[in-house]
Amino acid sequence: MDFVMKQALGGATKDMGKMLGGEEEKDPDAQKKEEERQEALRQQEEERKAKHARMEAEREKVRQQIRDKYGLKKKEEKEAEEKAALEQPCEGSLTRPKKAIPAGCGDEEEEEEESILDTVLKYLPGPLQDMFKK
């Protein structure tokens, strides 16, 4: 019967004791092996990061060659120039630049009101039109 149980369970009988709360076998070199494994993982990670940095440097070099060839600017440089242009006041102008004026502000509303008033005045008889225009 013992033979049949061992064959049915395979090598799981050794692990059964561990699963039921028994003590694990103590490996005298387990801590040393774990440290070696951690060191190997750390080295692999460093190598991966170094490889990634080299590849990114090569890509940036190619990007810069393309920018130089076609006279393009980096996105950050372009944004900085646009921002500086907006902040710099126009020479001889006492007003803000048009882009700095928020939408809905300014003379647009007054023009709409005047056009509505003009439309209403057109439908009034002549003497009333004269009264409202004064």
From Swiss-Prot:
Pfam families: Synaphin
Swiss-Prot/TrEMBL keywords: Cell projection, Coiled coil, Cytoplasm, Differentiation, Exocytosis, Mast cell degranulation, Neurogenesis, Neurotransmitter transport, Nucleus, Phosphoprotein, Synapse, Transport
Region (Interaction with the SNARE complex): 41-97
Molecular function terms, GO-annotated: calcium-dependent protein binding; SNARE binding; syntaxin-1 binding
Family (UniProt): Belongs to the complexin/synaphin family.
Subunit description: Binds to the SNARE core complex containing SNAP25, VAMP2 and STX1A.
Cited InterPro entries: Synaphin
Keyword Glycoprotein applies: no
Chief location category: cytoplasm
Compartment(s) where it occurs, according to its Swiss-Prot or TrEMBL record: Cytoplasm, Cytosol; Presynapse; Nucleus; Perikaryon
Name by which UniProt lists this protein: Complexin-2
PANTHER family per record: COMPLEXIN (PTHR16705), COMPLEXIN-2 (PTHR16705:SF9)
